[in-house]
């Protein structure tokens, strides 16, 4: 190998010092790729909202497959990576690019030479000559230059079909194993360019010798239109990826702050993660903005200030405005798409009132627009994950992304209402500066995040009873969900710090972290009342009640908890649990 050849086949973006909590997906796709040698791996989609780290996962798995196998082993799994572009000149250009990309990846792996992946370093004619003459490549693979030549000469029927079938043809004929990683898979169908290869993909993805792992940035198009119907329906297993949990969002926040040398208090880190909805991109953007402004993040007020700046003119603004404007350009049939998207974001509730939007269009823009036209535009917006469309119920709602919704309000004032950009940004900073603090007990909230992650890590396992002051070990169920700060009724005492739902078994947990103050019987009784609310609301057979008191408990509280079967943990107990499930201990504040 050339000494200057990098130790990666495809460059990743996130620094190792920062990368957080995607190990499950890295291992899952790596192991599934290796398992393809046994012909037991199904084509799989990694499905999730934008900016959740899907592309990074694919790149890291590809690099691992590239370097951690013996490339000379005929049973080695050959990784191929391709990202579908947003615009396609014609079918000939696509077929040429797809076939050449496959040739480069296959040859680069088999010869362990990453320089073959670069068209700038290794020109096409040199690649063709190498493949045609190298003794270390299979005779079947050596025929690929012939296909490339016929495509370049436009002397082949259905070039796009021949292109996407090529990896399977090689693996089937050689009885070898190839795994194809396809990013931006929603771009297999681009109506505005009269480009659609979805139908041809069916034959390609069904081969046990050549499973395809796909992902993309438009979740709705992928799930509903490309994989959820038509020729590819039922051909893919699904691996959903969600936002980071509170614990790992907190960990990422701390890592990014250290990387960018931003002062960050332990207490505010989980609040940054929560306000960003656990989205890695948003978290990183806020920390980078703080670094740019030389602003320490020490409380909610400083966090709000950074959110206001970044939403209106920073990294988040640049990313989301590009995303929104590109999608609107793609679908703008009526000249009213921007207005409808903006007015949808202004709706007070989560559900969008179409009649109100119709009325607002008339009042604000003087346009008479039918309900059917508005629905049609909303459906198109939902395809770009800008609106949530419940097709079975026939109603629309805001997307579950509070940062995006807040951005759309600012974007609409500037881009749609044409208000003064500087004034809008200044108003947003004022609004965010005056926001009421959402979390009064920052230390208690931090502990809740750790408690929730303990439950998630311990699913289907037992935890030592001693850490709950119980004689027997505690069996933890598989949870449908574990939520923080969930409210199941009116009044302040109906909010659960931690609520885990596991069908007939429910968990309710409380956290108290107040310096010099032990938890007493009153707090225990309030928690027991909350548990009863959960029992009735969820019709539960079993409700596990768990109380964390950082400063400990009064004698009376311990007596009551023993009588009522309440699990309880001190700081030392919680640290013991964190050690047991291999998480870092609570920070010392």
What is each residue range found by the language model?
Residues 284-371:
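Winged-helix-like regulatory helical subdomains adjacent to P-loop NTPase cores
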Residues 1-72:
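Walker A/P-loop-proximal flanking segment of P-loop NTPase domains
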Residues 42-43, 48-182, 188, 194, ...:
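P-loop NTPase nucleotide-binding core
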Residues 224-274:
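Helix-loop-helix "sensor" segment of P-loop NTPases
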């Amino acid at each position: 190998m050339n000494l200057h050849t990098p130790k990666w086949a495809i460059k990743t973006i996130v620094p190792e010092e920062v990368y957080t909590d995607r190990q499950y997906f890295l291992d899952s796709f790596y192991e599934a790729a290796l398992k393809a040698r046994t012909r037991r791996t199904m084509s799989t989609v990694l499905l999730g909202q934008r900016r959740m780290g899907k592309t990074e996962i694919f790149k890291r798995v590809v690099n691992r497959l590239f370097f951690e196998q013996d490339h000379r082993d005929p049973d080695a799994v050959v990784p191929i990576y391709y990202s579908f572009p947003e615009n396609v000149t014609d079918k000939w250009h696509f077929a040429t690019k797809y076939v050449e990309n496959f040739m480069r990846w296959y040859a680069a792996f088999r010869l362990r030479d990453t320089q073959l992946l670069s068209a700038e370093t290794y020109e096409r004619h040199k690649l063709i000559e190498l493949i045609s003459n190298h003794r270390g490549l299979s005779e079947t693979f050596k025929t690929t230059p012939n296909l490339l030549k016929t495509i370049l000469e436009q002397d082949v029927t259905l070039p796009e079909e021949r292109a996407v079938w090529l990896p399977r043809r090689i693996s089937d004929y050689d009885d070898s194993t190839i795994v194809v990683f396809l990013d931006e898979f929603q771009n297999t169908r681009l109506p505005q360019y009269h480009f659609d290869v979805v139908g041809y993909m069916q034959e390609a993805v069904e081969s046990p010798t050549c499973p395809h792992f796909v992902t993309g940035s438009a979740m709705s198009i992928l799930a509903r239109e490309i994989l959820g119907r038509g020729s590819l329906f039922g051909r893919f297993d699904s691996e959903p990826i969600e936002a980071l949990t509170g614990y790992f969002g907190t960990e990422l926040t701390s890592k990014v702050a250290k990387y960018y040398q931003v002062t960050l208090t332990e207490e505010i880190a989980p609040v940054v993660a929560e306000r960003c909805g656990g989205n890695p991109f948003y978290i990183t953007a806020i920390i980078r903005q703080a670094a740019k402004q030389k602003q320490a993040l020490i409380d909610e007020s400083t966090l709000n200030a950074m959110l206001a700046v970044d939403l209106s003119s920073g990294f988040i603004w640049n990313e989301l405005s590009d995303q929104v404007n590109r999608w609107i350009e793609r679908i703008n049939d009526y000249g009213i798409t921007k207005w409808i998207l903006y007015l949808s974001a202004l709706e007070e509730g989560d559900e969008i009132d179409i009649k109100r939007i119709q009325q607002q269009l008339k009042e604000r823009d003087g346009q008479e627009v039918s309900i059917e036209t508005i629905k049609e535009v909303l459906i198109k917006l939902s395809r770009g994950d800008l609106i949530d469309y419940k097709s079975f119920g026939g109603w629309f709602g805001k997307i579950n992304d509070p940062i995006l919704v807040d951005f759309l309000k600012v974007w609409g004032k500037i881009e749609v209402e044409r208000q003064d950009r500087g004034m809008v940004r200044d108003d947003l900073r004022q609004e965010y500066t005056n926001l009421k603090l959402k979390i009064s007990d920052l230390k208690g909230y931090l502990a809740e995040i750790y408690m929730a992650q303990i439950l998630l890590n311990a699913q289907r396992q037992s935890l030592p009873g001693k850490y709950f002051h119980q004689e027997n070990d505690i069996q933890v169920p598989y949870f449908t969900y574990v939520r923080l700060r969930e409210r199941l009724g009116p009044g302040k005492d109906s909010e659960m710090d931690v609520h885990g739902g596991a069908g007939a078994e429910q968990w309710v947990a409380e956290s108290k972290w107040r310096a010099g103050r032990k938890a007493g019987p009153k707090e225990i009784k309030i928690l027991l009342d909350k548990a009863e609310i959960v029992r009735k609301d969820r019709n539960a057979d079993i409700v596990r009640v768990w109380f964390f008191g950082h400063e400990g408990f009064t004698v009376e509280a311990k007596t009551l908890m023993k009588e009522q079967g309440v699990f309880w943990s001190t700081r030392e107990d919680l640290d013991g649990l964190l050690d047991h499930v291999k998480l870092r201990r609570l920070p010392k504040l």
